[in-house]
Amino acid sequence: MKSINLFSIIGLVAILSLWFVSCEKDSDTEKPVINLIEPEEGDILQIGSDVHFEMELSDNVMLGSYKVEIHSNFDNHDHGTKADDAETAFFFERSWDVSGKKNADIHHHEIVIPENSIPGDYHLMVYCTDAAGNEAHVVCNVILSHEGGEDHDHDHEHED
């Protein structure tokens, strides 16, 4: 009799535990939002200069990190499928931590295009991952050139 009561109690606890776990809030499945402000589609980025990079990130729960990648688009590939590896004249990839925030206003000049970079069409890609691992990305077509580009005369102070 005691063993029947013990098994009944264990069974009841197991059922209640499963019910409690199944009633927890759904996990975060919403991707973060990327609003790339600078550079804009088709901008000319000057070789030998830094890039004025500005964007706004937001997430419904919590941001995690973002990554910027710049690579050549000499073969006019797209990012719908994996393209063959093309010779990359200039390549940049770096990640930044933005964890602990729901919103982040990003502004920096940490991307520098070396003097020996080959001019041409490039993809600037921004990836943002939230704390739950959901990822969003945007692609911006830019042109690297020895002439033209930004003069960096915009309304903010630079830190030395």
Regions found by a protein language model. Give the residues of each.
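Prokaryotic Sec-type signal peptides and long signal-anchor helices
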Residues: I10-G11, D78
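C-terminal motif of bacterial Sec signal peptides marking the signal peptidase cleavage site
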Residues: L18-S22
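Bacterial N-terminal signal peptides that target proteins for export
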Residues: M1-I10
